[in-house]
Amino acid sequence: MLNLSKSSQVKTEANAQEAVHCKLPAGIHRWLHTLLSSLPFKLRINFWNQDSYVFGAEIRETLPQLSLHIGHPGVLRSLILSQDPLVLIDGYLHGLINIEGNLEALIPLIQTHPHIVIKPLQSLQLWVEAYTLPQLPFNLKAMPLKDGQQIHSRDRDKAAIQHHYDLGNLFYQQWLDPLIVYSCAHFEHPEMSLEAAQAAKLDLICRKLKLSPGETLLDIGCGWGALLRWAVQHYGVRGYGITLSQEQLVYNQQQIAQEQLANRLTVELLDYRDLPQQPTFDKIVSVGMVEHVGIKNYPTYFQAALQALKPGGLFLNHGISSSDICNGSSVGERFINRFIFPNGELAQLSTMLSVAEQTGWEIVDVDAWRPHYALTLRHWAENFEQAFDQVASMLGERKARLWHLYLIGCALAFENDYERVYQTLLRSKTDKTWNLPLSRMGWLS
């Protein structure tokens, strides 16, 4: 709850009264009509002063109607002056924009309009009218970059990981599967349950790596440890995991003790850049971690894995990639960077593979999983909706809205090929002898 001083409370109350009595300026109304005229559905906007207008395909009565309530004129003020649709997401998260109908209908609209277009002849009148509207009483801040911290430095990466993953293990348990696997599942058919699909993914990774009893397996960014425990219990390996999340470390230690795996499994709080610089592990896996590395650090990342792998070993890298070169400029990417994954960065698969080859890896296999992640995210979003009230009581209404929007938006991103995900199997170029089966089916048997 906000702790406002008496003077700030008076100012806030005055701002609220001014907002209630503020009319929608005529020029802004005309601009909205032009901007929204091509919508493929009927959109009703209910404004803060009880005014209500219909935009878009209003004559097509058979199309579903979506209703927006804009609770403060400062939303439109900020939208016009910044020309940034991220303002709409800010407003939704703060409860200043409420939606009745299908939330998904708005996400593609925002995604395909990365900038609000204002024609030169409109701009002067719009900006003047926007300035006359009351300001929002607050601004939503992104995760700040502390003085002296550089993007993808060790300290900054640790802070970014903890910003996302240290929301509490109970939070993630509300909507993930029982093993708390926070990465793409593998569905043998669309009706497969999330729990079964996650177990199938874990086992598929173990088979791709050709795990054998007694081998050592390193998991870079091991999360809550489901893959390591699966490999230890089903394939007889000795597991070693690293994470930068304190919450994940605590959970892993609890599970290791509960399942009596202390002599076969170790998890530590460690940066991948501090891995042993000599061959230590028979097999290495990294699932959903490369997105946090940063493109400029790809050589360091692939080199760290290469140095830690024993001769004849395999490295499976599972990560999200971009379908095109956006440079982090799309609305979806900026939203995720600002609120969800600070400093997350996606490259095209070709960039990732090129760096891997230049670092000294041979590419053995590339497996596309985009439809699997779309299905995974649909399961997560559905679970989250069912647990929304519990999440809101834990983290607050704003964060609950934030994560709900994030999961739906990501599902749409994979369904519409804005984002992709691949599993890449690698081995050192110095391993000249082919010690793998000749056919793909042979590896997976």
Functional labels for PLM-detected ranges:
Residues 320-434, 440-444:
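Substrate-binding/catalytic lobe of Class I Rossmann-like enzymes that use SAM or dcSAM, i.e.
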Residues 260-272:
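Conserved SAM-binding strand-loop segment of SAM-dependent methyltransferases
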Residues 213-221:
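Conserved class I S-adenosyl-L-methionine
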Residues 1-192, 196-198, 204, 233:
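Feature captures hydrophobic
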Residues 312-320:
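Conserved beta-strand signature within the Rossmann-like core of class I S-adenosyl-L-methionine
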Residues 273-284:
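A short acidic, Gly/Pro-enriched loop at the edge of an enzyme's catalytic core
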Residues 299-311:
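A short glycine-rich, Lys/Arg-flanked "PGG" loop and its adjoining helix->strand segment in the class I
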Residues 224-235:
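Conserved SAM-binding loop of SAM-dependent methyltransferases across substrates and taxa
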